[in-house]
């Protein structure tokens, strides 16, 4: 199989490329710079120069491919909605249209953010599966969630309403961690290297996290089942509690960790105050960054992935305990 990957130097993209090459597939990947192209080539894939706004480059990458894994996305940026729309929504439309035109299967890396993080966490929801719907409120200023929802809607328009019809699967991971992560894991590593970690409450709640290698395994499962279409949660690859995540990550880092438990009733007002300070100091910063972090840390994982296990036959390849320690070791060695 020949597969074109976007976001090939990002967290999920790197794991997808590695998994594809390990089983003998041919891989090309979009590379927006000489450095990115060298990184793609270093992994054993063939770089296609261009970024997510470069329509001819995307067309060239998709042409001749049997399938596309679209993993490129802006997760956190201070550049405003237009930047999110251009990179996450318009670019997804371009990739999906090219895939439909050239008859390539599309695996779109979406997010559980499409459900509306305010509803799933604030509402105390449990067992959020794909029937939950994507019409619930989104935090004001949560450009990432809005853009991922609109991007996925664009995929379904092309799959169900436009010609030629697109063969597509959307994978909805929760917070992704793993080796090479420049978003979440790198921040965890920076904090834990100090030898002190913080948990909200007693830390016994299962976190909404998934290992990048297990997301890649889901992408390959979707590629191998071209008759299956639709959206799938990839948000539960085994339970790992808030406290266990911190302790195992620190173990991988080689750090003796002291864990501080912060009561929930103190964490929320502190996060609200921190958001106010952040917005004053850095105009354009996400409106609810610290409150979103408290929600994520302090609530149990509400998402279930049984549909992916059943229809895609997705099986996580690395258990969480090993994956967290492996991630910590990577950041230890990369320091």
Feature-to-residue mapping (PLM):
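Active-site Tyr-X1-5-Lys
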Residues: 139-169
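Glycine-rich Rossmann NAD(P)(H)-binding loop
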Residues: 178, 200-205, 232-240, 250-253, ...
């Amino acid at each position: 199989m020949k597969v074109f990957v976007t976001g090939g130097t990002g967290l999920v993209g790197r794991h997808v490329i590695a998994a594809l090459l390990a089983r003998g597939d041919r891989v090309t990947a979009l590379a927006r710079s000489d450095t990115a192209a060298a990184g793609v080539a270093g992994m054993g894939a063939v770089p296609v120069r261009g970024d997510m706004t470069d329509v001819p480059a995307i067309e060239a990458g998709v042409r001749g491919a049997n399938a596309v894994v679209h993993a490129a996305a802006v997760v956190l940026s201070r550049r405003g909605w237009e930047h999110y729309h251009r990179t996450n929504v318009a670019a997804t439309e371009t990739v999906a249209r090219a895939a439909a035109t050239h008859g390539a299967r599309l695996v779109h890396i979406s997010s559980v953010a499409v459900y509306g993080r305010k509803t799933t966490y604030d509402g105390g929801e449990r067992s959020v599966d794909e029937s939950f719907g994507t019409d619930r409120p989104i935090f004001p200023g949560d450009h990432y969630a809005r853009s991922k929802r609109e991007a996925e809607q664009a995929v379904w328009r092309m799959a169900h309403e436009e010609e030629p019809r697109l063969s597509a699967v959307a994978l909805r991971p929760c917070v992704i961690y793993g080796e090479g992560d420049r978003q979440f894991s790198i921040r965890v590593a920076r904090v834990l290297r100090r030898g002190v970690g913080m948990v909200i409450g007693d830390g016994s709640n299962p976190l909404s996290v998934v290992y990048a290698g297990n997301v890649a395994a889901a992408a390959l499962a979707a590629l191998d089942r071209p008759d299956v279409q639709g959206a799938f949660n990839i948000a539960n690859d085994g339970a790992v509690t808030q406290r266990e995540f911190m302790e195992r990550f620190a173990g991988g880092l080689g750090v003796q960790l002291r864990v501080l438990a912060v009561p929930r009733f103190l964490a929320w007002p502190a996060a609200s105050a921190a958001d106010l300070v952040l917005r004053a100091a850095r105009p354009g910063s996400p409106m609810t960054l610290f409150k979103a972090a408290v929600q994520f840390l302090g609530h149990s994982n509400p998402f279930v992935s049984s549909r992916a296990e059943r229809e895609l036959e997705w099986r996580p390849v690395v258990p969480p305990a090993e994956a967290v320690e492996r991630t910590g070791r990577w950041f230890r060695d990369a320091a």
